[in-house]
C-alpha cells in the first residue's frame, strides 16, 4: 500500500460520514481522470463546430431521483456516480441533498485542474437555465 493510500485510509477513519461519502464521490471522478477516461470522453464529444470555435461547454450535474425517469447521480462527460440505491437520496446514511453543493464544488475544481494541466482554459459557471436539478457549466477553450 502506498503511503498516500495508507494516510487516506487513516484520515477516513477520523472523518465524518459526510466527509467519507464526499471523498468517495470525488475519488470516483479522480480515478476517471487518472485513467484518461475523462479526456477520452471529452475528445469524443467534440463536434466540428466546437473545434472551429475552439470552445466546448460540458455539464457537471447532480440529478435527484424522479419517479419513472431518472435515478440520483453525479455526472460529468457521461461518467456517473450513483448511490447504493439510485432511487433514494441517501448513501451510507448520508443525505446527498445535504452535501451535493460541496461535492459539486470539489468535482468542478478537480475538472478545472485536470483540464488546465492539459493546456486548456477553464471557466466554471452555475447553470441558471436549469432549475430542476443542480448543474455547473464548465467552459473549456483552447
Where are these regions (language model features)?
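N-terminal leader/targeting segments
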Residues: 1-105
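Short amphipathic alpha-helix segments
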Residues: 108-113
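C-terminal edge-of-domain segments
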Residues: 114-142
Amino acid at each position: 500500500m502506498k503511503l498516500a493510500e495508507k494516510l487516506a485510509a487513516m484520515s477516513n477513519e477520523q472523518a465524518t460520514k459526510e466527509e467519507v461519502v464526499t471523498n468517495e464521490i470525488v475519488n470516483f471522478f479522480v480515478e476517471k481522470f487518472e485513467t484518461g477516461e475523462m479526456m477520452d470522453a471529452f475528445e469524443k464529444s467534440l463536434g466540428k463546430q466546437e473545434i472551429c470555435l475552439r470552445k466546448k461547454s460540458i455539464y457537471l450535474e447532480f440529478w435527484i431521483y424522479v419517479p419513472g425517469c431518472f435515478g440520483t447521480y453525479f455526472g460529468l462527460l457521461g461518467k456517473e456516480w450513483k448511490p447504493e440505491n439510485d432511487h433514494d437520496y441517501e448513501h451510507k446514511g448520508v443525505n446527498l441533498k445535504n452535501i451535493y453543493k460541496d461535492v459539486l464544488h470539489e468535482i468542478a475544481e478537480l475538472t478545472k485542474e485536470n483540464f488546465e494541466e492539459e493546456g486548456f482554459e477553464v471557466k466554471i459557471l452555475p447553470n441558471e437555465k436549469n432549475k430542476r436539478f443542480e448543474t455547473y457549466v464548465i467552459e473549456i477553450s483552447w
